[in-house]
Amino acid sequence: DNVYYCGYHSKKSFGAASYFIQRPDGNVLVDSPRFTPPLVKRLEAMGGVRYLYLTHRDDVADHEKFHKRFGCDRILHTQDITANTQSVEIQPTGTEPLELAADLRIIPQPGHSAGHTVLLYRGKYLFTGDHLAWSARLNQLYAFRNFCWDSWPRQIESMKALAHYTDSYRFEWVLPGHGRRFQSAPEAMGQQMHQCIQWMDSVR
């Protein structure tokens, strides 16, 4: 489905992973990698960048450089806008999902930060930023309790809402900024989401 891991992590984004979605209606760069010539040339060869989607305020890195190079529209929830991102072109508000396109849905998931969102692509790939990842130690999906900057109870409520998307959209991939990626059948993903919520409740 033309989903790629970018590499070229940036210290400005605390080493977070970023991803690239190649699609006929415009490519999407998910969170900002380091702006470096080999990557930029590769992105150009693959059709450039239409949207630079930023999951939250921590992982914006070289967003301005990518915007200037590709003329892409940047996307960041208004609750996570800072002095460094005031010029972002698209600033979703509120807590309702936003249909960016027929195959792209932005889902607000406050908790890690006040304006954290996740991106669902084709109902199959969920780009989760710092909201949700696979833990090899726990052998399950989890959230980052020690790196929750807004509200842990709020993040739990967000995760419960996200679990409903597992039932509705049956996504199969969790692609985080930190932590391990995870893939499973939709039924197992639903079980994992509920197990994650139980764990989050246990470490309040």
Language-model features: locations:
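Flexible, charged surface loops at secondary-structure boundaries
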Residues: 13, 21-24, 44-48, 120, ...
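Zn-dependent metallo-beta-lactamase
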Residues: 1-25, 204
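Metallo-beta-lactamase
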Residues: 27-29, 35-36, 72, 82, ...
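Short, hydrophobic/aromatic-rich segments at coil-to-beta transitions
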Residues: 2-6, 101-107
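Residue-level detector of beta-strand structural context in well-folded domains
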Residues: 17-19, 96, 117
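Short, conserved beta-strand segments within well-ordered enzyme catalytic domains
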Residues: 20, 29, 53
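Hydrophobic residues at beta-strand termini and immediately following loops
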Residues: 6, 30, 92-93, 109
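Active-site HxH/HxHxD metal-binding segment of metal-dependent hydrolases
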Residues: 15, 34-102, 188, 192-199
